[in-house]
A protein has these predicted regions:
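Secondary-structure boundary/capping motif
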Residues: 11, 219, 244-246, 380-384
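N-terminal secretory signal peptides
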Residues: 1-14, 40-41
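Divalent metal-binding pocket/active-site signature
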Residues: 168-170, 178-264
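A general, composition-driven signal for non-globular sequence regions
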Residues: 6, 10-11, 33, 63, ...
Length: 407
């Protein structure tokens, strides 16, 4: 659908409705120099001169924005242990000032995308996140059902969605039930290498989905846990799509048609089969995932949204940023950051890893906490309707996850 209602009016055409809207936004704490009021554009934060349209602000604030991979505050490599870990483990470490940064970001649901190298490690991670949410009930809820999305639509709290980036913690099929009961609502089958379920995209040989992997998918879909194929290799991805009987997801992956030759991206065949199952694919905001070389801009990210929309419909595209709140702010050429990059993995060159001139991994313009507004502006530029933008910002994730969890 095309919506040209975003055309900026000139000063003499400012309506009474616009003026009332401007006053409401001012009351919400926006910084609005007088000329910007007349153009219906507003500054969201004092430290930046970036201005956003009234339409973009309305869309973000009127949507439960879901990022299916946003690691909260994990990637500030100059701070060890990561702030996320400190906040989970130290009483009262998360402050009102920290909350304000999250509250004003535009994100409403964080898929925290933890690693699960073992059963015991996954239990510990789940316990820490459950403890964190319980420690700050005035600010956070754990998202595990459709009713939680409905709740977030009416209050200012933020949802924590417990998901893992592999399934190594499932020692037996019954462990799926155990972790569902503890709050886990999504799991990738594999990370980068081969495990008991299938092969990740860095595996030397893609052996496809194993019998055990098929059993895990069946149990996940029975209990209502989302099957995530983000890091799975090609044959494993296609096998899993064939084995699934209900919607599955790709939490964060680019389109191979837009980034040719990138094995971490999904082919059109995969995207079509995902859509036929009713699934959704999250578009990342990391330079080396959306384009094989520099320069990279937000327009390259938008190209992936466009490709999914044109191939299977806007109903199957969402956000899967693969960043933390502040956009993985530290340059990767810092000593601390180099320790966090798993470049010693076999076949790491398949990532086509590269950073910008500033050493940062996040796409410029999407490298800050309020990037949801920049994404909304970009989708407006691409002439999507308000309804379609709302779907891509969060409505699609809300629909598919509610369906999966509602078994």
């Amino acid at each position: 659908m095309i919506d040209d209602s975003a055309t900026t009016p000139n000063a003499r055409n400012v309506s009474r409705r616009s003026a009332v809207g401007a006053m409401a936004l001012f009351a919400a704490g926006l910084v609005m120099p007088a000329p910007s009021v007349l153009r219906r554009r507003y500054r969201l934060f004092a430290h930046s001169t970036t201005e956003y349209s009234e339409r973009a602000i309305r869309l973000v604030r009127g949507t439960v924005v879901v990022d299916m991979l946003n690691q909260f505050r994990f990637a500030d490599t100059a701070i060890r242990p990561p702030l996320s870990e400190q906040w989970k483990r130290k009483p009262n470490a998360f402050t009102a000032a920290n909350w304000e940064e999250y509250r004003t970001s535009g994100f409403r649901v964080f898929g925290v995308g933890e690693g699960a190298s073992s059963y015991d490690g996954a239990l510990r991670t789940i316990a820490e996140w459950n403890g964190f949410v319980a420690a700050y009930p005035q600010w956070f809820i754990r998202v595990g059902g459709a009713e939680d999305f409905a709740r977030l639509a009416t209050d200012e709290k933020i949802g924590i969605l417990l998901d893992f980036q592999n399934a190594d913690h499932f020692r037996t099929v019954d462990d799926v039930d155990t972790f569902w009961g503890l709050g886990q609502r999504s799991s990738q089958l594999t990370y980068n290498q081969t495990n008991r379920l299938g092969s990740g995209f860095l595996a030397e040989t893609d052996g496809g989905l194993t019998d055990y992997g098929a059993q895990i998918i069946a149990r996940m879909q029975k209990v209502g846990m989302a099957v995530d194929l983000a890091h799975a290799a090609d044959r494993t991805t296609l096998d899993a799509l064939a084995a699934a009987t209900k919607p599955v997801i790709v939490s964060h992956s680019a389109c191979r048609a837009v980034a040719p030759g990138h094995l971490r991206a999904k082919t059109d065949e995969m995207i079509v089969k995902l859509a036929k199952l009713g699934g959704v694919m999250g578009i990342p905001m990391i330079r080396f995932m959306v384009k094989l070389d520099e320069p990279v801009t937000i327009e390259n990210v938008l190209d992936h949204f466009d490709h999914v929309a044109k191939t299977v419909g806007v109903e199957h595209a969402g956000i899967g940023g693969d960043l933390d709140l502040v956009g993985n702010a530290n340059p990767v050429n810092s000593a601390e950051a180099k320790q966090e990059i798993p470049s010693n993995q076999p076949n790491f060159d398949r990532y086509h890893f590269h950073a910008g001139p500033d050493g940062k991994l996040a796409v410029p313009g999407l490298d800050h906490p309020k990037r949801t507004y920049d994404l909304a502006e970009g989708l407006i530029r691409r002439k999507y309707s308000d309804a379609d933008i709302g779907l891509m910002l969060g409505g699609n994730w809300r629909r598919v996850l509610s369906s999966i969890w509602g078994v």
